[in-house]
Swiss-Prot record:
Keywords: Nickel
Xref: PANTHER family: NICKEL INSERTION PROTEIN-RELATED (PTHR36566), PYRIDINIUM-3,5-BISTHIOCARBOXYLIC ACID MONONUCLEOTIDE NICKEL INSERTION PROTEIN (PTHR36566:SF1)
Name of protein: Putative nickel insertion protein
Record-stated family: Belongs to the LarC family.
Annotated disulfide bonds: none
Annotated organism of origin: Pelobacter propionicus (strain DSM 2379 / NBRC 103807 / OttBd1)
InterPro entries per UniProt: Ni_insertion (IPR002822)
Gene Ontology terms for molecular function: lyase activity; nickel cation binding
């Protein structure tokens, strides 16, 4: 059965608050440490800790990243490559890369440069990388399929950054907040950080009132500061959707009769990197007996506008049709299991809470095949033996 999370952002949202709230829902800190170790970051460049604290007499979990590597500037391309080259599971990599992609797009627009030329300052630091990748790791551990958030407080005043003193919300944050519900019913201070806004921009299907759901757990993550008006806490409600509630999935498609296979393959890569759930091509017959291709992609409703714009800019399409669809999905989670090649991540699928099947993660098998010079299908066969798949 699918799980959803609703973030109650009454005080705002940041990267560390998000990770803290998800850890408070039951993600083990050791699991987060082990998964982050799959990134090619020096093990001694940071340390993680959690502790219980209070914000205006309300208990919450505080997540701290002590940074020992003081380098704060990294290019978007370097960070994206770092995540892409890691042995993290596919869903974790996709979510983390989608968040950084939204950040890069916002920074590029604000500073008038190409996305590939974006250099992150505060967001390029190790703690921000940990916050973003850590969010993706925790969501995957909890088996979360959908994410929503309450309307966001804008905040006011000014914030000190590497670019100097900037108004609140910071320009990149303001860009990321486009299309989201916001309000001004809060005191001064930065309530929504660029990282927090990027997490919602990339992953949330809606920023609105709490959806109908059966709540199974509540996590509370504390921010670094105390505000005079409200407890600086992010609450995360984990549960199951009620009744026939849609998870906001859409199918978008367009017909193309004058493109090359190379270009279409490139567009598929761009769509998947930008957060599309699936992309596929269907051969079709078009007017004047022209053979063509129907390009289709599946996405959350919050990403439709951006993905459609990508297709319209990168292809000869002059329009895109889209419609909502319902899905029946299996519950899933990731688990590391011992194999003859060492520990590898497996995707576990469940039906009505009962184990259905397990499969090794493709990228991990691909890495083993390349490193050891073994055919990929042989690696998959070996690690798919019953004693491994059943966890024996």
């Amino acid at each position: 059965m699918k799980h959803i999370i609703h973030f109650d952002c009454f005080a705002g949202i940041s990267g560390d608050m998000t990770v803290a709230a998800l850890l408070d829902l039951g993600v083990p800190l050791e699991h987060l440490r082990d998964e982050l170790a799959r990134l090619d970051l020096p093990r001694d460049s940071y340390s993680l800790s959690i502790h219980r604290t209070e914000r205006r007499h309300l208990a919450a979990l505080r997540f701290d990243v002590q940074v020992l590597d003081q380098r704060t500037e990294r290019g978007y391309a370097a960070i994206d490559g770092l995540i892409a080259a890691s042995s993290l599971s596919g869903p974790v990599r996709e979510r983390a890369r989608a968040i950084f992609r939204r950040l890069a797009e916002a920074e590029a627009l604000v500073h008038g440069v190409a996305v590939g030329e974006v250099h992150f300052h505060e967001v390029g630091a190790v703690d921000s990388i940990v916050d973003i990748v850590g969010t993706a790791i925790c969501l995957d551990y909890l088996g979360v399929d959908g994410l929503s958030a309450a309307p966001l407080p804008l905040g006011s005043g000014f914030v000190h950054t590497a670019h100097g003193v900037l108004p609140v919300p910071a320009p990149a944050t303001a860009e990321l907040l486009k299309g989201m519900a916001v309000h001004g019913e809060c005191g001064p201070g930065e309530r929504v950080t660029p990282t927090g806004a990027a997490i919602l921009a990339a992953l949330a299907t809606s920023v609105t009132a709490q959806p109908a759901m059966t709540v199974t757990a509540v996590g509370s993550g504390a921010g670094s500061r105390d505000f005079p008006d409200v407890p600086n806490i992010l609450r995360a409600f984990l549960g199951r959707p009620e009744g026939e509630m849609s998870d906001g999935v859409l199918v978008a498609e367009t017909n193309i009769d004058d493109s090359t296979p190379e270009l279409l393959g490139y567009v598929m890569e761009l769509l998947l990197e930008a957060g599309a759930l699936d992309v596929f091509f269907t051969p079709i017959q078009m007017k004047k007996n022209r053979p063509g291709v129907q390009l289709s992609f599946l996405c959350r409703s919050g990403l439709l506008e951006r993905l459609a714009a990508l297709v319209l800019v990168e292809t000869s399409a002059i329009g895109i049709r889209h419609y909502p669809v319902s899905r029946t999905t299996l519950e899933r989670c990731m688990e590391e299991r011992e194999t003859p090649f060492g520990p590898l991540p497996f995707k576990l699928l469940f039906h009505d809470g009962r184990p259905l099947r397990a499969a090794p993660e493709y990228e991990a098998c691909r890495r083993v095949a390349r490193e050891r010079g073994i055919p990929l299908q042989e690696v998959i066969r070996i690690v798919s033996q019953p004693t491994v798949v059943e966890g024996g």
